[in-house]
Amino acid sequence: MASAKDAQPAPEKSLSSDPQPEPSKKGARFWLIFVAISLTTFLAALDTSIISTALPTITADLGSESLYVWIIDAYLLASTATIPIFAQAANIYGRRSLTLIAVCIFTLGSGLCGGAHNTAMMVGGRAVQGIGGGGILTMSEIVVCDMVSIRERGMYAGIIGGVWAIAAVVAPVMGGAFAQNISWRWIFYINLPIAGVSLVALGLFLKLSRPPSGTFKEQMSRIDWGGSVLLIGSVTSIVLALSWGGSEHPWSGWQTIVPLVIGLLALVAFFAYQGAPWLREPTMPLRLFSNRTSSTLLVISFIHSLLLYWICYFLPVYFQAVKEASPTRSAVMLFPIACTSAPAGVAAGITITKTGKYRVWHFTGFVLMSIACGLFTLLDAQSSTGRWVGFQILFGVGTGTVFTSTLPPILASLPDSDVATATGAWTFIRNFGSIWGVAIPAAVFNNHVNHAAPKISDSSVKSLLVDGGAYEHATQHFIKSLSPNPDLKTQVIQVYLEGLKVVWQVSLAFCLLGFILCFFVRSLTLRDELNTEFGLKEEKPNSNNMSSEEGVVRD
């Protein structure tokens, strides 16, 4: 059990005066579990964006043109809203059972989507997938945190972050390839054998300890039902507003403003409720935000996730509308971010494990991202491949180092008993940031296009681009259709470039905000010992006592 001492982080010590022990060697069982967790993380990350390039084919086949947005949003909504719930339930029902349940739910959702014959079944399947995906993302981080010490977590977080980055970037390419060459249904069916292998491996090797949690009635009474309802309602309203804004309805319309205000008020009510004295186990306890380091790093994680999605959603606009790349080609053109963020994150994690120092990676990451976002403003129709590749490399290295270096110090500033809730909060805030990382630049882009559109001489083309139409028409097909009129094509591309320039400028402001926040993070000692009630059970032959902790039961 965590002691009061665990809750008080100590200042970072000099390595020369206090040498740290080498990390313990991991056996085959550990690596089998870690590979299985990484595979499920890859699948959950893959399904956040794999349908983006295949969506036109799916909607045409199912006849769901008017509801296409929900094929995307159902997954995002379900995964984000259920993350803190899985984190809390992991403390009550154990890590192993929740991990297996999450993988099973995700697999079921994949099967439903692959076999969908109408839009309702597809949206329902995506929602089921999202619940499982949110659980996988949460439980994978929690289980890894229970298997290694805080000091070692940076390295493994870097690997998982690399898996996520690679999946997010290759997903559109895979989706387009399946839709064009085989069938869009295999976008979902491919998950079944991979998830099945992971499920078997986790079932066989993921044997964890957990403390007694009482009777079924006692377990149910520990769940924060009120907080869960408020959080799900809040996320649902906010996602609705951000999905409708600028597309179905104008940002200034009541259809957008009302659900957005309701969602934000529900979020405020959720956090107020989390501080209620009668609440036994809050979904997201306020103590997670009670110290400067954890609260600052959670905000930094929000900004980092926002920026990652910001860039990954709007660079394809540049590639397709300005460089006239196909959707699949534009996805390939994003590879520099994935190919650099993954190794950079792993390298930063290894360094953190060896030295215990993490603040330098916060500063380094935001400096590199700031430089990259500033350089993005220089991109135009004549920019060489070397330019947009080089700028992405800077951003990829920066985003990889920040991702790896945020969770370990958050956990170091809190008692070990808060591992699950803190990890769940970190994962939720990252997902929540990704929602705004698409909505904010979209609003900025659409607003500037509306102001720049009068420069377009053709009124019919102008009408296609205003009020949110520019993002929808940022395609190779649309731009090439203007080729018979070179002057008009140049005008349209210039409007896109002006809108994108403002998008990059605003992203730079968020990078600088993240950099400033880095100064508020304290240097803490990353604990070398693993102190948890939910750790990996040691195989002890000829012994019925499978845990050194009295009262610990099999999960």
Curated annotation (Swiss-Prot):
Induction field: Expressed under high amounts of nitrogen via regulation by GLN1. Moreover, components of the fungal-specific velvet complex VEL1, VEL2 and LAE1 act also as positive regulators of expression. Finally, expression is induced under acidic conditions in a PACC-independent manner.
Swiss-Prot/TrEMBL keywords: Glycoprotein, Membrane, Transmembrane, Transmembrane helix, Transport
GO molecular function: transmembrane transporter activity
Pfam families in alphabetical order: MFS_1 (PF07690)
Xref: InterPro entries: MFS, MFS_dom, MFS_trans_sf
Effects seen without this gene: Does not alter fusarin C production.
Keyword Protease among UniProt keywords: no
TM stretches of this protein: 31-51, 67-87, 97-117, 130-150, 159-179, 186-206, 225-245, 253-273, 297-317, 332-352, 360-380, 393-413, 425-445, 501-521
GO cellular component assignments: plasma membrane
Compartment(s) where it occurs, according to its Swiss-Prot or TrEMBL record: Membrane
Membrane topology: Multi-pass membrane protein
Annotated spans, Disordered: 1-23
Entry-listed glycosylation sites: N181, N291, N545
PROSITE patterns attached to this UniProt entry: MFS
Biological role: Efflux pump; part of the gene cluster that mediates the biosynthesis of the mycotoxin fusarin C. Within the cluster, FUS1, FUS2, FUS8 and FUS9 are sufficient for fusarin production. The other FUS cluster members are not essential for fusarin C biosynthesis.
Similarity remark: Belongs to the major facilitator superfamily. TCR/Tet family.
Protein's UniProt name: Efflux pump FUS6
Gene: FUS6
